[in-house]
């Protein structure tokens, strides 16, 4: 049987772990060929703590290069041998959130869309993935680079010579997030507890979700990968929750959720969900 191949397209270092980390580890453990393409170096990220604060964009502006090392370490924890960057490391700069001033380097959202699409399409033709994973049209939570990564990936899948059998969006389950936030255990005292009502941009209904992967067996790998992104992510001592620079406490969910954007679904369970992104494909 042909070896399964999966490609994950993400906007910044750490996104691969935050949204699809356990999925990546799962398919690597199954013997699949897994590649991660990151579109920027995450130069505009907010730095947690004082140790690496001088790397930030308003100081030395060296964060992007440092985050290559973080990404490399995180991918190693997930079983991926090396990072890949769209157009090469540093080709397009992190765009920052809405309102972030443009820098000298061309931002990802301002780049030549045709060039970006052709570059990713060439990678798809090289890697020939059976499954491609990226964000939904809102980029998960509205970040301009996530939205742009969705658009570029969608266009590249359509433009590539290789016919990708299945395209998925990584999404959050509204019901699972609400339950996990409500039942979350002790967190560091400086973290901020919120409810699902405080996170209006997050979440899909159960009816809108197509796949849910129970990845409990790979949560330790995901937590180790989260810890590798130390300038961006703080992880609780017990590994059950994490926070970004805003100190909002979020659960480490053992299940990762997906919407099938293109292709045919395989077998579904009693909830109407696939439990394997490779379901319906003749690959191992």
From Swiss-Prot:
Organism, as annotated: Mycolicibacterium vanbaalenii (strain DSM 7251 / JCM 13017 / BCRC 16820 / KCTC 9966 / NRRL B-24157 / PYR-1)
Alphabetically ordered keywords of this record: Hydrolase, Metal-binding, Zinc
Broad enzyme group: hydrolase
EC number(s) on file: 3.5.1.103
UniProt remark on cofactor binding: Binds 1 zinc ion per subunit.
Family, similarity comment: Belongs to the MshB deacetylase family.
Transmembrane segments: none
Catalytic activity: 1D-myo-inositol 2-acetamido-2-deoxy-alpha-D-glucopyranoside + H2O = 1D-myo-inositol 2-amino-2-deoxy-alpha-D-glucopyranoside + acetate
Annotated positions binding Zn(2+): 12, 15, 146
Protein name (record): 1D-myo-inositol 2-acetamido-2-deoxy-alpha-D-glucopyranoside deacetylase
GO biological process, one term: mycothiol biosynthetic process
Domain of life of the source: Bacteria
InterPro entries hit by this protein: GlcNAc_PI_deacetylase-related, LmbE-like_dom_sf, Mycothiol_biosynthesis_MshB
Cofactor field: Zn(2+)
Gene3D superfamilies in the record: LmbE-like
Job of this protein: Catalyzes the deacetylation of 1D-myo-inositol 2-acetamido-2-deoxy-alpha-D-glucopyranoside (GlcNAc-Ins) in the mycothiol biosynthesis pathway.
